């Protein structure tokens, strides 16, 4: 029996999320069905992070145990030849039986993309949130992020329906960067609450539009004012960038940002 780890990408707009669900197509079910076809074994996969419906992944990490005699480094090619074009396997490696895609991760990295141009862009529509009620003040939005790094209770940013026992988690790094009309919000944390990133982005947009101040933003999460956090960003602008592990077992992940860099030029 071998434990195999994969780095995968998927277009979340075609799936109900990572996790298996009744009467819906998930990434997990699609991959497990493919593994069954090539091995005739019922395989259970485990992911570093469970993305919601519509959320993309550029460097998701999963693992599974399998008793099937093909070279480990061939799993990517074998699976890609059978999977739909909306899922790609970038790399396959053998790992120790004690290694776990979720529990061995030091932190996860999510990125949210906002297109703040007056004119929507067809080629960015699937991968970003086109939001233009007014020009977003990225300076105020960045100021609002002050104090979020570290271990905190982010209950205000947790959507209903979570099965986590605690809303406390540790943000390793959080930053906001604007390039022309694209705003990228990067969050690295040991774990993420249900709907956490999209809730944070929804509130940051209110700051950028001068509907609330950076102090009000901070007050809402510090004082756990969940009832005031009503706005949430749509799923399509969110991407699971990668997971980082103490031992660098992959050639591509950890060293490279697998998320494409979008640039808008030519109109304003």
Swiss-Prot record:
GO biological process terms held by the UniProt record: tRNA pseudouridine synthesis
Residue sites binding substrate per the record: 110
Any GO molecular function: tRNA pseudouridine(38-40) synthase activity
Record-linked Gene3D superfamilies: Pseudouridine synthase I, catalytic domain, C-terminal subdomain, Pseudouridine synthase I, catalytic domain, N-terminal subdomain
InterPro entries: PsdUridine_synth_cat_dom_sf, PsdUridine_synth_TruA, PsdUridine_synth_TruA_a/b_dom, PsdUridine_synth_TruA_C, TruA/RsuA/RluB/E/F_N
UniProt keyword annotation of Protease present: no
Keywords per UniProt: Isomerase, tRNA processing
Pfam families, alphabetized: PseudoU_synth_1
Leading EC class: isomerase
The EC number(s) this enzyme carries: 5.4.99.12
List of catalytic residues: 52
Annotated catalysed reactions: uridine(38/39/40) in tRNA = pseudouridine(38/39/40) in tRNA
The organism's place on the tree of life at top rank: Bacteria
NCBIfam families in the record: hisT_truA
Subunit architecture: Homodimer.
Family, per entry: Belongs to the tRNA pseudouridine synthase TruA family.
Role played: Formation of pseudouridine at positions 38, 39 and 40 in the anticodon stem and loop of transfer RNAs.
Protein name listed in UniProt: tRNA pseudouridine synthase A
